[in-house]
Amino acid sequence: MNTLNQQYEEKVRPCIDLIDSLRSLGVEKDLALPAIAVIGDQSSGKSSVLEALSGVALPRGSGIVTRCPLELKMKRKKEGEEWYGKISYQNHEEEIEDPADVEKKIREAQDEMAGVGVGISDDLISLEIGSPGVPDLTLIDLPGIARVAVKGQPENIGDQIKRLIQTFITKQETISLVVVPCNVDIATTEALNMAQRVDPDGERTLGILTKPDLVDKGTEDTVVEIVHNEVIHLKKGYMIVKCRGQKEITERVSLTEAIERETAFFREHVYFHTLYNEGHATVPKLAEKLTLELVHHIEKSLPRLEEQIEEKLTQTRAELERYGNGPPSDAAEKLIFLIDKVTAFTQDAISLTTGEELKCGDRLNVFSMLRREFGQWNAHLSRSGEIFNKKIEKEVEEYEERYRGRELPGFINYKTFEVMVKEQIKQLEEPAVKRLKDVGDAVRKLLVQLAQSSFTGFPNLVKIAKARIEAIKQEKESTAESTLRTQFKMELLVYSQDRTYSSSLSDRKTEEDEEEDKRKVKTFHKERSILYRMDNHATLQELMLHLKSYYKIASQRLADQIPLVIRYQMLQESASQLHREMMQVLQDKENLEFLLKEDSDIGSKRAALQSRLKRLMKARAYLVEF
């Protein structure tokens, strides 16, 4: 750390403290924080590297020794200041007086969280260490990757560990510190493979080579090439360190002495002295690089972090608003609370049916559905008219033969006209009723959605509202169906104002004349249609004009009238009756407790949201003050 200039050194601790403070608040539950995660295969020397950086002994041995994610917060103190330590997990927090107790305390924490034995846990243990001999740095140590389950471990222990590691290194905010022994083929290490899968360009991966003293003779050049980034390229490059081996631990070689031996090893090594001279070797150089990388990473991440906190705050407030504050304890206040709830719901129901904005904030739109349904009804009438026109041309002669009485040729048979019109009108009745039922179902669905939104967390209120909505839907649908069927009975009377009918007939004649002119050009030398070869073709032509003209009037009438009936009963009347019936619910004061009984988990959800809001607001305050 001595190579850092004073100005930069003053920025280091505040940056790291900021993220540590956010993590201690629990903000990591809500969004990803900048971090360095240490990963490696079992026996890669990962624990030894962390020991060398922190100056304290950590759990080590064969098998899985890191069984929970360990947040290692190192704080560099001034020379002469005392060492201190603190361990925190779940609801437990304990100061550590002696550095020699750290390993024991971590094992106790792991047993508490992952069970005694060899299981693992996703829960974080936080270890804070302050000492003049440590860098300003925070790392997250993750369990070593196990290839084969040992006695007492679940068969899928390897998959469990990989899933845990994946949750950390997948985040773009995480730098992966991959620990690899020098005496293995780097390309085959699972830790590096995992890092490459989530970070194929090596943008946020840093390689650490360990155990350089165990390299096979003749392979030293390969190690140098790896550190020089010539084998598997990583943007952040590689470092190489030599930590205490088991022999040195047995001989009680101190960490300070181990670092001195490490420096001598690299400085004097035939092949590795170049790495030492280039600043790629030793634990102190690694500490310096990691601190610089973390601070740079934090500074780079801060703008996005601020945005994420604002987004989460907005989202959390919106969710809390949906859950509300919960019912008050005082009976009189409870009644007021219920009245407000029910009134807001019924007002929103009326607003929904009139196209106004809802107070609950939901974006429910009944009129987009109505436009679609009524548009389809209009399209059905148009298609029916086209089919009717074609049918007229085919069957009008047959009807004339069947229904013509004593009239001389050239006289229009009104009975023929009436029979054909009635037959066509009848075919529209059931499609109109189906349209009513489709709209009724859609309106009920929207009102139920509104009830669930308005009475979130109050299942009994939702149940009562749904029952009322269903009963009203059945009643209004029945009334509307009766009105529709009456409308179709009236349509069988075959009536229109003279002026309206004359206008429609005139328009139709003009259209027919234009079509006839076109047809004459095309069929000048051809045989004319059967209609024009008939002696009474003028009569039949006239009858067709009347039929088409009248159907146009009737269909226009139905295109408006059917939607009006449906809209009036299923929207306006339904909303008004729902308002009246929900107001009646308020008269039953004895059921107050029943109506305001909350979901069993609603209180815990509200508390969780309030807790999230609190920590996010604190997090924002930290960022503002930074």
From Swiss-Prot:
Residues 242-245 are annotated as: G5 motif. It is found in: Cytoplasm. The keyword Amino-acid biosynthesis does not apply. Gene3D superfamilies: Dynamin, middle domain, P-loop containing nucleotide triphosphate hydrolases. Keywords: Cytoplasm, GTP-binding, Nucleotide-binding. Residues 65-67 are annotated as: G2 motif. PANTHER family: DYNAMIN, INTERFERON-INDUCED GTP-BINDING PROTEIN MX-RELATED. Residues 540-626 form the GED domain. Residues 30-303 form the Dynamin-type G domain. Residues 141-144 are annotated as: G3 motif. Residues 40-47 are annotated as: G1 motif. Residues 210-213 are annotated as: G4 motif. GO terms for biological process: defense response to virus; receptor internalization; synaptic vesicle budding from presynaptic endocytic zone membrane. GTP binds at residues 40-47, 141-145, 210-213. The lineage of its organism: Eukaryota, Metazoa, Chordata, Craniata, Vertebrata. Induction: By interferons. SUPFAM superfamilies: P-loop containing nucleoside triphosphate hydrolases. The gene is mx. Its main location: cytoplasm. Belongs to the TRAFAC class dynamin-like GTPase superfamily. Dynamin/Fzo/YdjA family. GO terms for molecular function: GTP binding; GTPase activity; microtubule binding. It comes from Siniperca chuatsi (Mandarin fish). One of its GO terms (cellular component) is microtubule. This is Interferon-induced GTP-binding protein Mx.
